[in-house]
Amino acid sequence: MLWFQGNSMQLARSSFGLFLRNCSASKTTLPVLTLFTKDPCPLCDEAKEVLKPYENRQPYKDQKLPGTRRRRSPSSPSHPHMASQSGKRYNLTLNQVLSFDYDMGLDAPKTISSDCGAFYCLRMFKSPDMTCCFYPKQ
């Protein structure tokens, strides 16, 4: 009888601890990922498809940009890349950008860009104060 009572008390304690942890986790607010898009934009559509599985874990807001003004960066290649604050450049796909691990010891990437017109920005998952901008081809 004592053995059963001891196990049930231990189970009750661990269940109560999980309950408290879940209650405190529900009070934390996640940063909202802001996706600036422009119609038509194939890279923006690709980003939305990549983000679809994460909708329930990471909230994001779709912000439409007006206008068709072209933006050019003299040093950027024709495909998206990421530049760190120290000036290093990483040639990455959108999937690699979204899963970039800031704990790898690398400088945290600052911007993503390429030589095209419309742009959109992604606020990174692990670093909510960091924004990455894409300039997709038109």
UniProtKB/Swiss-Prot annotation:
Biased composition range(s): Basic and acidic residues: 55-64
Keyword Electron transport: yes
Keywords: Disulfide bond, Electron transport, Transport
Spans annotated as Disordered: 55-88
Pfam families assigned: Glrx-like
Disulfide bonds: 41-44
Entries under Gene3D superfamilies matching the protein: Glutaredoxin
Entry annotated with the keyword Transferase: no
Family membership noted in the UniProt record: Belongs to the glutaredoxin family. YDR286C subfamily.
Protein name in the entry: Glutaredoxin-like protein C5orf63
The organism of origin for this protein: Homo sapiens (Human)
Lineage, highest ranks first: Eukaryota, Metazoa, Chordata, Craniata, Vertebrata
Gene name of the encoded protein: C5orf63
